[in-house]
Amino acid sequence: MLLIAAFFLGLLFGSFLNVCISRLPKGESVVHPRSKCPKCGASIRWYDNIPLISWVLLRGRCRDCKEPISWRYPLVELATGVWFAAVIFEVWARSPNEMSIQLSGEWWAVHILTSLGLVILGFLLIGLMVMDWQTMILPDSFTLGGIAIGLFLVCTQALFLGPNEDQIVLSNHHIQLTSPGGVTDHGNLFFTGPESLIFGRIGAVCGAALLLLLIRWIYRAVRHRDGMGLGDVKLLAMIAAFLGFWPAILSLFFGTLAAAVYGAVLLARGRAVAASRLAFGSFLCIGGLIASLFGNQLINMYIALLR
């Protein structure tokens, strides 16, 4: 029942996501005016705007001008619905230790915050994937806004850390620390509580952005042209804000792999040349979706292979 509810909720958000995809790259408001047919300009009636159902009943055509309605609309709605259901299944059907975003503390807070973070990230990634593919634009309202949301969720997560994760650790005997109880000792100071979680995630955002900026600079120095835009840098930083540094690197790996395979297919078919541009952000979004649900499992499998 919960999966069905999540799926239908995802359909509703997918319908709104279609509005964002159509308007944000043009700099238009997503609130007004009302949605209209891009061909004839007729306003879309509320009963013609029901996710999936209206498209099927209208047989994929505008009620007024009979022009075809793009397949993108039902596909985005369906993808968002499936994503919402997949997140609920992954988070609520598995142990918290196997989640893509791991927390401890109150179990209900763990599940709710993890679910919320993943559905928001998936919503943003699906939208950015389509927008970059169609327009080569990654709007700041999604990327920078996503970074802000991800960091806000991390700060909220810090409120629900378990008691064993809110400690101060001393080691190596380099500095002196006096505790409120009057005990004096020497050592390095390590935070394992809220400070570690929050500053660790901020560091992940900065690290991911700097890494892609470095790759961008090296590519420009070697090829004498830009290989990726700053939007891709902000996109990877957004993924890191939600998932952390290593899942973001995993996203970069899968995104690069997918882009390389797609580019090789285009070259083999003669549909592109070496200098052709690819919507790398779209492939990075695919990598982000994979890392969101399976990132920790894949990283743990890789570590196990190295042992």
Where are the regions that the model predicts?
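Interfacial loop-to-transmembrane junctions
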Residues: M228-G231, A264-I290
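Transmembrane helix-loop junctions in multipass membrane proteins, especially transporters and channels
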Residues: R23-V31, F89-N97, G162, D166, ...
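Hydrophobic, lipid-facing residues on alpha-helical transmembrane segments of integral membrane proteins
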Residues: F8, L12, F16, L78-A86, ...
